[in-house]
Amino acid sequence: MIQQESRLKVADNTGAKELLTIRVLGGSGRRYASIGDTIVATVKDALPGAGVKKGDIVKAVVVRTTKERRRPDGFYIRFDENAAVLIKDGGDPRGTRIFGPVGRELRDKKFMRIISLAPEVL
C-alpha cells in the first residue's frame, strides 16, 4: 500500500535511486496504490550524469510492495521492499533494464513491456 509521502526504490536503470510519492493516480479520492498502479513521484536520490535528476517530477508504476496482496486463487504475494519503474506518458518504461522480480498484476494492467524486460514475474 503506497500512499502520499511513501518512499520507493527504483527498479530500473534510469539513474534514479529513490522516489517520494506525490499522488496516486486513478480517481480524485484514491488513497493507496498497489502493484500495477500508477503514481506521480519526485526523484529524491539519483546517480550523477543520469537521465533524471534529483527534484524531477516523474510518473512511475509500482512493481513491488511489502504489503501482501491477495490473488484471485487465494495466494498472497509480498515482497521485501517497495519498488517502482519510471514510465513515459504512453506507459512504456523510460529505462532499458528492470532489476528484480515484478508482480503478475502488471500483466492485467497492460504493462507488457515491463513484463518482457523483467528477469522474473511472480
Curated annotation (Swiss-Prot):
Pfam families: Ribosomal_L14
UniProt keyword annotations, A-Z: Ribonucleoprotein, Ribosomal protein, RNA-binding, rRNA-binding
One term of GO molecular function: structural constituent of ribosome
GO biological process: translation
GO cellular component: cytosolic large ribosomal subunit
Naturally occurring in which organism (per UniProt): Thermobifida fusca (strain YX)
Subunit note: Part of the 50S ribosomal subunit. Forms a cluster with proteins L3 and L19. In the 70S ribosome, L14 and L19 interact and together make contacts with the 16S rRNA in bridges B5 and B8.
Key word Protein biosynthesis present: no
Family: Belongs to the universal ribosomal protein uL14 family.
Protein name: Large ribosomal subunit protein uL14
InterPro entries attached to this UniProt entry: Ribosomal_uL14 (IPR000218), Ribosomal_uL14_bac-type (IPR005745), Ribosomal_uL14_CS (IPR019972), Ribosomal_uL14_sf (IPR036853)
Key word DNA damage present: no
Main function: Binds to 23S rRNA. Forms part of two intersubunit bridges in the 70S ribosome.
